[in-house]
């Protein structure tokens, strides 16, 4: 038998051992990262509490009964505890009647008061909190690696332990005194080590370490950019770590305590869910699962879709066989639903709409997963479900679409009642004061409760009414569940093109004009037949229902003009390059004074610089911008100090068009932008991502897709 190369084997064994140690260290460092975050949160909470001292009178010192001459402090100009905290010992000592003992007592009392405030303080992140934001972002990155590497880590540990426990493979001396059986064992073990260290599995493990190191060392600029793009993820992480407290009374709202405890006691399985949930979202998912047939009415922007996906992920994880979910939604959000499900879960998606609907239906029925269809397509699939298959959950988005019990689409959906183990209706429209509409919806999910609701309808603002609704209707508002500084959330609204959109887009491709193609879905005069136009109207309707104002941005004057015509009187003003700079503030002032639901139209470059538009809390972009700075300059007009509402940003996009390519291009180049967060010449060089070569390639690609016969 040929003797193994024990020197080489020792190197490989050391590599395996080092990898195993690094893996264990990777998980151990999670505790250190969490502790660092808690300490940084404590510092910020203390700072915030200290800032609040200005709101408390120096008279608070009297309550300590420490004999402090409060009147002398007031006479010297110290009116608040904040004034005292900011003063030096020498400044306080100069006040007549205040000696060292009183200074010591004052410092102790003010410190204790500040500490008590910080205990209940909600950490409110600001861009300047670079240390905490960076620590959170690094933790997110590292935790994802730890989660993804879980199975590999266990496998590596088992093999490392096995190798470490074999004395014969480590020492050539054993070979000299071993019989043929032990030598054969040693050769087999050596062969295993060579194979293992060259395997794809071991390579993947080493790849995890590279990703982990990247996460540990990512820059503060990258972290700040991520925070500005989606602060909600940072707050969700803070909440999950216990560094900020969810507003529990409003998570449950008026749900009776016994029911709330029953719901909260449900063990939510998120093993198949990829993302972070806020406390109120966890409760919402549990509510959906525990109550089975419900109406989720959370205010727009609180993540009803994510809660529904979390519930689906739980059902899928606990099921023994395949699951069937059916989502019915407006056509304008079909693509969005598919992308969200794929983003936050491992559930297969099937779009039941348009050409190929029968084939997609058959594959969904056979393979399981989530089918997504629009109201208009229900007639084509209902016969295939009714009395033929079971649905683990039926989800009706924008449920007010079926408020009319006599409408054909309502009758189609009601036929699936007996086939659905769970039914979830979703709407962001407040229904408490629309009792008849609510009863029509409740009659679908809980017909036994309709008469009870109607019996107390005349006291719709009293606790009895809410308690009657509690088992079937859950609604939370932003002001109730998001107590921190308002986060900004961005959503991609993928709108499937209409026939008019497609025809106009094909004509634009024929011109080979990049600028014309960018106006996809806004090229035709009549935007009522535009997919983006329809979705824009829906979003503006939601703004009216929620009592919010919206800013609509486009790079193009023609688009602004056509959207103005579409919106009509709800548009309070237009800011474009044609409007003189001195007139723009007057338009902003008029918008600020306008009624809720009003819309301001802005050309990106005209309305993106030098204006404060805090009156708006909804921002809609009609197309992707060629420079990230254009987008963020526009957003900064709304999302800035003084904004008291959560800001929701919608990007209107059409799949299989120039929009999709531009979004991908932006994502590919994001790392370059993260390196140059500040405005500078260098930032500008990285900012202009749409170079001529890329544009030419894109036009060629679109031409081949839509005009394959045109040379």
Residue ranges, per PLM feature:
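A conserved SF2-helicase RecA2
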Residues: 626-711
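Interdomain linker/hinge connecting the two RecA-like lobes of the SF2 helicase core
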Residues: 435, 439, 448-451, 457-548, ...
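Conserved SF1/SF2 helicase motif Ia
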Residues: 295-302, 307-339, 419-422, 547
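Conserved helicase ATPase core of P-loop NTP-dependent helicases/translocases
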Residues: 359-362, 549-553, 561-562, 566-607
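Small-residue hinge/turn detector
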Residues: 66, 84, 96-99
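Conserved helix/coil segment N-terminal to the catalytic DExD/H
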Residues: 317, 356-393, 404, 414-415
